[in-house]
Amino acid sequence: MAITNGYCTLQDVKNALRISDNVDDTLLELAVETASRQIDDHCERVFYQTSGATRYFVPRDSYVCEVDDLVSITSVKTSSAANGTYDVTWATTDYQTEPNNGIAGGISFPVTLLRSVDRYVFPISGGETTVQVIGTYGWSSIPTAIKYATILLSSRLFKRMDSPLGVAGIGDIGVIRVSRIDPDIDALIAPFKKIRMA
């Protein structure tokens, strides 16, 4: 099998596990892809790119619209009648992308928010999608911490076959229970998790 949208390579994991043969390559590739999707789930975002995608959003208010992670924007349109027809095309001078300077918390981030400027406002209509954004979604490159977390998680998933039912024996220490998410992996991906308000 080939890895689809993996955040590390097969060779990265083989190097980490000190594996030089190709006997388990299919299982290792499965571990990489599974680890990558688990990281997506934990972070509530994807780091791979989808080019030329059209997505629709509900603005937070008349001036702010949160969007999926964007590497580049081709067009922004709004539906003035909230009827699914996106009839108002915005110029790049009609909105500001955030985070400012592409940095959030000291980390390079893609665009996650559009703020209206000048004379345009985002139409609000009872929670309906009134904003259409066409562009390249995802991240320009996989963050180093995400790549390393994927290597660790892929290795862990692969080694689970040697660890029955989440319990591992360690020499003189005895038996230890394997936790749900490795604290090191959690610490690596924490800055990239979307924060949700209830």
Label each residue range with its predicted role.
Residues 1-198:
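Divalent metal-cofactor coordination and adjacent catalytic microenvironments
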